[in-house]
């Protein structure tokens, strides 16, 4: 290979899926009452909260009439790992685009934060299945910088595969097999086509299989109307749950807020805006409010109705990350000289993010959570998620947002 050739890098960031799961009966309980208060955890949660909301708002800006589903953890992990081999403006843009203040946080602490987060997500003794994986696919005649390789393995638990990108079908199969296996077959054909000058690919996936602590009874699921907009209504299977639930109305957001726990240490926050208040919710929601919802748990007698659904997201990260200031890595001025020892310039030719979500009735009986139980209404409220709503799924120990979504039409997969 000669220095005049420009090589391409393919980034498959955040190939993720979230599906319901039945847990084994003999699974051991873990103590989830203690939040992880280490500086690394606090740092990553703060930045990921900002990053998740900026990314969400950019997706809304690009299309306000579509379902949204993505994993901020996966996207941030992939770009942070890539930053290990970047230099100059390319390096600065990546980390600042991920909402890190480089005057307050050292690069070493950033990577330690991601290392700690990935270790937390991949804990084998959790009551739910939550796992991540990073794969580096390197052309068989390309020599990587040893420091990049070491740090990618150490901080990001990366696996390295030697492939022949000249045989594009064979290389594509190796990458797709890695993702398909990691997501247990939920995401196939992550790569449909490889650019002919690709010599290096990075793939990141996240798999989450969880069960509700308070399950929905399938016998109570009935067909109901969901109002996509003022003129469009669709029929959906609507799940129903009654009892002591963590649901309240937030006047600041003009929205109902519902918190539902998965077995283990993961919580889903659902946000249902009042009529005509979706834009207000999207503009007002911030990480401080979300943190308060997670910390100040309260239950009251209520009934909720929420659609059973399967949605997915498929995004071109070049158009998504550019408004966040991450641009240099995608053009010929990219400095990724810390990745390979070769002289030819390397740029990120393509970056894609694919995500799949399924929400249904399955769950486990709840062990009583330690919460403040209050009754706000004289009559139990009935909250119907029968028009567009948002949701965020958090890992509770680190309070990191692992999934973010918006349901506009539950019938669109």
Curated annotation (Swiss-Prot):
Location relative to the cell: Secreted
Site (Reactive bond): 377-378
One GO MF term: serine-type endopeptidase inhibitor activity
Keywords recorded for this protein, A-Z: Glycoprotein, Protease inhibitor, Secreted, Serine protease inhibitor, Signal
PROSITE patterns cross-referenced by the UniProt entry: SERPIN
Predominant subcellular localization, coarse grouping: secreted
Region ranges (RCL): 368-387
Signal sequence residues: 1-24
Protein's UniProt keywords contain Secreted: yes
An annotated GO BP: response to cytokine
GO cellular component terms given for this protein: extracellular region; extracellular space
Gene3D superfamilies: Alpha-1-antitrypsin, domain 1 (2.30.39.10), Antithrombin, subunit I, domain 2 (3.30.497.10), Serpins superfamily (2.10.310.10)
Glycosylated sites: 64, 101, 265
InterPro entries on file: Serpin_CS, Serpin_dom, Serpin_fam, Serpin_sf, Serpin_sf_1, Serpin_sf_2
Keyword S-adenosyl-L-methionine tagged: no
Comment field (misc): Murine alpha-1-antitrypsin is represented by a cluster of up to 6 individual Serpina1-related genes. The precise complement of Serpina1-related genes present varies according to the strain of the animal.
Record-linked PANTHER family: ALPHA-1-ANTITRYPSIN, SERINE PROTEASE INHIBITOR, SERPIN
Main function: Inhibitor of serine proteases. Can inhibit trypsin and chymotrypsin; relatively ineffective against elastase.
Domain remark in the UniProt entry: The reactive center loop (RCL) extends out from the body of the protein and directs binding to the target protease. The protease cleaves the serpin at the reactive site within the RCL, establishing a covalent linkage between the carboxyl group of the serpin reactive site and the serine hydroxyl of the protease. The resulting inactive serpin-protease complex is highly stable. Variability within the reactive center loop (RCL) sequences of Serpina1-related genes may determine target protease specificity.
Record family assignment: Belongs to the serpin family.
Name by which UniProt lists this protein: Alpha-1-antitrypsin 1-4
Species of origin: Mus musculus (Mouse)
